[in-house]
Regions:
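A glycine-rich beta-to-alpha transition motif near the start of alpha/beta enzyme domains, typified by
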Residues: 1-119
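Catalytic phosphate-donor-binding core of small-molecule kinases
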Residues: 105-118, 122-140
Length: 152
């Protein structure tokens, strides 16, 4: 990785998950796994839970790839997806308040609540029902749909 190359990024957090967000339309990262490992280190890097790559797709308004701090690619993070919604709107990459986001876990719908000054107040995302590998401590719930909103 070229240590002299400038990469434009923003670090954001959602309910304790902090990530480094990079728009791949304007930045190329040849080895995202290596970058995530290096940049996520708290003392010698930027410090984060991982790297989020924001891209474009013909199937969705935006795409999101999650590269965890260990270099492995994740499927979905609700907190990161809400940060993507806030970032793309407040950066002027979209004027839509209802966005589609393609992830490894499938298509997600983001709903943004924006104030009169153009600042995103909340971002809601519908998440899939979690898949638990250990069902011993699970409990049935009335409504399996999970909706997460970012509130200030």
């Amino acid at each position: 990785m070229d240590n002299n190359k400038k990469i434009h990024f923003i670090k954001m957090h959602g309910l304790g998950n902090d990530y480094i967000f990079v728009d791949t339309e304007f930045n190329t990262i040849p080895d995202p796994a290596k970058a995530s490992i290096e940049w996520s280190k708290p003392h010698t890097g930027i410090g984060s839970d991982g790297l989020i790559l924001i891209g474009r797709s013909p199937e969705a308004d935006f795409t999101m790839r999650i590269i965890n701090a260990d270099g492995l690619e994740g499927q979905m993070c609700g907190n990161a997806s809400r940060c993507v919604g806030k970032y793309v709107y407040e950066s002027g990459l979209t004027t839509k308040k209802s966005l589609s986001l393609l992830t490894r876990a499938g298509m997600k719908q983001l709903e943004l609540d924006v104030d009169d000054n153009g600042k995103v107040k909340t971002v809601c995302v519908d998440l899939m029902e979690p898949v638990l590998e250990d069902h011993r401590n699970s409990r049935p719930v009335a409504n399996p749909c999970l909706r997460v909103c970012l509130c200030q």
